[in-house]
Each structure stands twice: as structure tokens, then as C-alpha cells.
Amino acid sequence: MAVRAAVAGASGYAGGELLRLLLTHPEVEIGALTGNSNAGQRLGALQPHLLPLADRVLEATTPEVLGGHDVVFLALPHGQSAAVAEQLGPDVLVVDMGADFRLKDAGDWERFYGSPHAGTWPYGLPELPGARAALEGSKRIAVPGCYPTAVSLALFPAYAASLAEPEAVIVAASGTSGAGKAAKPHLLGSEVMGSMSPYGVGGGHRHTPEMIQNLGAVAGEPVTVSFTPTLAPMPRGILATCTAKAKPGVTAESVRAAYEKALADEPFVHLLPEGQWPATASVYGSNAVQVQVAHDAAAGRIIAISAIDNLAKGTAGGAVQSMNLALGLDETTGLTTIGVAP
């Protein structure tokens, strides 16, 4: 019997990518599609690439519309998911693609998001130690942020093997879709094309506490993170360059061995052959993650680089992967590691 899924926030980039993936998922039947500001409009006018759903009409996001589904995906702006989720029954699998339930520390949430903390749900990054067990059978899932997905998958093997000191410096470039679909002057083509620019510098980006939370949990001690995000002139993709001070005695061989061990059985995270480097173009449209690692002996640092599609593995693909685990399906169901090139 098919799993009936509703999508709240179907008109945005994350909601559109989720629907693209669900259309080819063999176990999912797409139910209600909602979007408050676009209620009453045809989906085809807002997401013209989703031809099989073009004539579906968006409804208001209400408990009555979302009720009666096995799974409800919330692709809503940060701070809006909690009010919707509390109106859904405990037997409904609710997958929040926003930030509302990712952080464990209420102080971090209030400092970075400026509203009361709604709580914490099982975290939808299965590759982290212990995460799969928490997701299996769960009825509530918090999908990670796109930057924390890229950074955590790049660095967790080093911390799991106790190779890195508890401080990391991260510079990550993201495509413009990470900023959402709403019109913003700095995302105009004339502003973005042919240019790169940092933002959220000096610890101001909202994804910073999420990275600290993830890496600290793996390391078993607090990890200091300096994160500088950069806007890149491309629609989608993240390239994260992450460095951490190596502990005494660490070698290139020990680093490589730790990453090979940590990622050997992961269906979506691929450690590239030595000498080959991650590229956002290689994971475009897929749930794949490319990782490469190096040891800078002169500087005494571990350099881990990852590439993801921010809308796929970084959002919608991660949501589907986590849903699969919660429902007892193979976690790769409906997902691909095949990118689109050129």
C-alpha cells in the first residue's frame, strides 16, 4: 500500500525539489499540496518543471487539509513549522525541512532565530554516528540545514577517529537557491553573475550552532567552529572546505584510513580516489556527496572538502532518505547518486 504524503510549502525551492523526488518514489502517493501565500494557484504556474502535477491547485496550510496523510513534509520558513506540527496527530510522520527542531540548546535557537525554542526532534543526517537508530520508527524528524550537512559529512570521520583538535575553520560556497525563492536585491542576476561575496561573517550565520552541535557530539567535547559562508554565482550546490588542527602523531595515512573506514558502507557519501577533488557539478540533482581529505603536514592541519546539492542531499533528498528509514524502507529508495552533467 502506498504511503500518502502531503507537502506544506510546495511552491518554494525546497518544496519543489521534494516533489520532484517524490514523483519517482515507488512507495509514495502525493496527496495535498499547500502554500498559504499561493493558495488557489495551479502548481504548474509556480513549478513548471513538475509537469505531472501541473494542474494540482495549492490549498491553505490547515490541519484539515494535512490530516489523513501518512507523512507530512513541512517546507516552511523557519519558525512556522512548530505551530503546524502541534496540530498533527502522533501517528503521522512529520518531516520538518525548516530549522525549528534541529537545535538542542534553547539559548542557541533564541539567539540565532529570535523566537521561543519549540523543542528537538531526531536529526535527519543518517550518516552521523547513532543517527540511523534514532530515525528508525520515528514519527518526528528534523532535516539538517544544507551547510551543516556538507560540513558534518566532511569532518565527522576525523572527529570520530580522534584525529582532530576541537576547533574547525570552514569556508563554504553555496548557490543562490539556498537563500530561498523570495525576491531579494542581492540575488538579482546583475548582482550575482560574475561575482562571489561572503555573508554572515564572524559567527553570524544561523547554521553555525548546528555545526557546533554535530561536531561536538561526534568528538565527545565542545568544538569551536569559525564559519564563513560565500554566495556563488550558481543556482544550486555547496562546496565546503573544512580544516581542523591535527592531533600529534597524525599522518596522511592515518587520516585516509579513518575516512575510508567511516564512509565505506555509506550509500550516498563517496570518498574520492586520491588526487580527485569534489565538484558541485558532479552531484547536481542527486543525493550524492563527494568527499576528499588531505593532511597538510607543514601546517599540521586536516583538510576535508565536500560537495553536495543543497536542494537534494542538503534538503529534500535528506528528507526522503530520513523518511525511508522512519518507515522501514531501504534508505536509498527513490533517490539517486547520478548527477546531471554538464
UniProtKB/Swiss-Prot annotation:
Its main location: cytoplasm. The keyword Amino-acid biosynthesis applies. Pathway: Amino-acid biosynthesis; L-arginine biosynthesis; N(2)-acetyl-L-ornithine from L-glutamate: step 3/4. PROSITE patterns: ARGC. Its EC number is 1.2.1.38. One of its GO terms (biological process) is L-arginine biosynthetic process. The active site is at 146. One of its GO terms (cellular component) is cytoplasm. It comes from the Bacteria. Keywords: Amino-acid biosynthesis, Arginine biosynthesis, Cytoplasm, NADP, Oxidoreductase. Gene3D superfamilies: Dihydrodipicolinate Reductase, domain 2 (3.30.360.10), NAD(P)-binding Rossmann-like Domain (3.40.50.720). It catalyses: N-acetyl-L-glutamate 5-semialdehyde + phosphate + NADP(+) = N-acetyl-L-glutamyl 5-phosphate + NADPH + H(+). GO terms for molecular function: N-acetyl-gamma-glutamyl-phosphate reductase activity; NAD binding; NADP+ binding. Catalyzes the NADPH-dependent reduction of N-acetyl-5-glutamyl phosphate to yield N-acetyl-L-glutamate 5-semialdehyde. This is N-acetyl-gamma-glutamyl-phosphate reductase. It comes from Streptomyces coelicolor (strain ATCC BAA-471 / A3(2) / M145).
